[in-house]
Amino acid sequence: MATEYALRMGDGKRIYLTKEKIIAEIEDGTANAADLGEIPALNANEMEKLAEILMMPGKTVSVEQGMEVPVTHDIGTIRLDGDQGNSGVGIPSSRLVGCMTHERAFGADTMELGHIDYSFKPVKPVVSNECQAMEVCQQNMIIPLFYGAMPNMGLYYTPDGPFENPGDLMKAFKIPEAWESMEHAAEHLTRDTVWVMQKLFASGADGVNFDTTGAAGDGDMYGTLHAIEALRKEFPDMYIEAGMAGECVLGMHGNLQYDGVTLAGLWPHQQAPLVAKAGANVFGPVCNTNTSKTSAWNLARAVTFMKAAVEASPIPCHVDMGMGVGGIPMLETPPIDAVTRASKAMVEIAGVDGIOIGVGDPMGMPIAHIMASGMTGMRAAGDLVARMEFSKNMRIGEAKEYVAKKLGVDQMDLVDEHVMRELREELDIGIITSVPGAAKGIAAKMNIEKLLDIKINSCNLFRKQIA
């Protein structure tokens, strides 16, 4: 009897497949992506490697030593303190505690602060509260800390916003009116996002994470690209990550263009150059999970799309890897076996520069991804490599080489806790364990500035305050 291997369906249900069936599913999945995106399918060696990853006997798997990448985040601390029946585990804790838990306990390379409603529009009335939270977090933390939110253009339509719902207008065959409503909403999205981030950047934020760009279609992406462009023009040193909502930009409007390119119907490899042109430092491509297909099919399809995006992108790519994207099952508690295999495949086959950790409980998302492919933040040198990706748009290889040279170590040492524990204390750039007298918060980041020859926004704010 043929050996069967434990895999998952796209909804997380466990299934058992033979190697022959796994290979067939991989071939079908990569062919689907190649056909839709008009991109190369995985070659025979890549498909064989993906099959090997899926068939590994361990519950968890990880990248080969030396291939680790930095992680970024969506939803911020909501996975800890959120309690809405989704992936939040409802731990009553402040956002400072949540952010520092990711930094000190989870070994995150970066982190983000976000509002419980997690969209830019609801932040406007409480922006002063967000600014104070950002200041307090920056005073206590060392890893890069973003402000994250969704552009969420749907909030600008009735009954939540001022503009008539284009869906209702289209049903009434009022197409020009629907276009006009989307265009007005996109303008307001740009304006609100820029205004919110002007306040947060003045409060020390390292940058911004645009989560689920394009969720409301091409108008949503249009407004976000113009927001990125405006922020880059005003703040040349702001870290900007733009993560997508889906693999293909929905043509709700159909005629909107950016830099002469029609946005409707763009696939990840076509989205990447536009996001870079707008001024983002890091692009977060997406491939949606099909819940009725196997993990072999979904992961092959996702890796195919991401490999093409990485090759086409002028900037680092942090593939979105929350539940329901990136070959990961659509389940609030994502199966760790599926998450770690997807994480490994994205790094070793697609060649991504990082992982954007998305929605899912703490064990199934940040802990699983960081164990599988992360650089473990301040336990080693993950935060330093992440800063070079964002401050200088360095791809993963260049960023590691730069940091290793500055530290005077081999690249393998960047993820060696024994080497980095001693070195971080010697250089006074922040250590993960609490040592009296060691530089913390702003002081440690000022030493990182000197080490890496960069400027850090929270340090600039502190210098202004004591001038």
Curated annotation (Swiss-Prot):
GO terms for biological process: methanogenesis; methylation. GO terms for molecular function: dimethylamine methyltransferase activity. Its EC number is 2.1.1.249. InterPro entries: Dimeth_MeTrfase_MtbB (IPR012653). Keywords: Methanogenesis, Methyltransferase, Pyrrolysine, Transferase. The keyword Transferase applies. It comes from the Archaea. Pathway: One-carbon metabolism; methanogenesis from dimethylamine. It catalyses: Co(I)-[dimethylamine-specific corrinoid protein] + dimethylamine + H(+) = methyl-Co(III)-[dimethylamine-specific corrinoid protein] + methylamine. It holds the Pfam family Dimeth_Pyl. Belongs to the dimethylamine methyltransferase family. Catalyzes the transfer of a methyl group from dimethylamine to the corrinoid cofactor of MtbC. This is Dimethylamine methyltransferase MtbB1. It comes from Methanosarcina barkeri (strain Fusaro / DSM 804).
